[in-house]
Amino acid sequence: MNTVLSVQGASAPVKKKSFFSKFTRLNMLRLARAVIPAAVLMMFFPQLAMAAQGQDLMASGNTTVKATFGKDSSVVKWVVLAEVLVGAVMYMMTKNVKFLAGFAIISVFIAVGMAVVGLK
């Protein structure tokens, strides 16, 4: 008769690496070796780095974006409706009031964000 012994879990404790172990001297040298050439190129060619002489390639789509996501668009209404439905369902599932009030907070963030970018 053969008996099988099974062990659940790891056989040896696994030590978790610290977040700060990524900031070693060797990793910082590798980062500097990658960043310094780009910084030197931007210093010698600032017009390419800052696009000082360029034209706005997205200006032609500005009216389309305002029509799609503007003040009276149906996309905004559908997003708000989806927020309300998801908040209600999550509240019913968890009985946590945070989910119920979450749609109001997200709606405020969306309204402020649209005002900042000029869509309202």
UniProtKB/Swiss-Prot annotation:
One of its GO terms (cellular component) is plasma membrane. Residues 95-98 are cytoplasmic. The modification N-acetylalanine is found at residue 52. It is found in: Cell inner membrane; Secreted. The chain crosses the membrane at residues 74-94, 99-120. Residues 1-51 form a propeptide. Residues 1-73 are periplasmic. It is a multi-pass membrane protein. Keywords: Acetylation, Cell inner membrane, Cell membrane, Conjugation, Membrane, Plasmid, Secreted, Transmembrane, Transmembrane helix. Its main location: membrane. Monomer. Interacts with itself to form filaments; also interacts with TraQ. NCBIfam families: PRK13734.1, TraA_TIGR. Belongs to the TraA family. Propilin is the precursor of the pilus subunit, pilin, that forms conjugative pili, the filamentous surface appendages required for cell-to-cell contact during the earlier stages of bacterial conjugation, and that retract after contact is established. Mature pilin is assembled with the help of TraQ and TraX. This is Pilin. It comes from Escherichia coli. The lineage of its organism: Bacteria, Pseudomonadati, Pseudomonadota, Gammaproteobacteria, Enterobacterales.
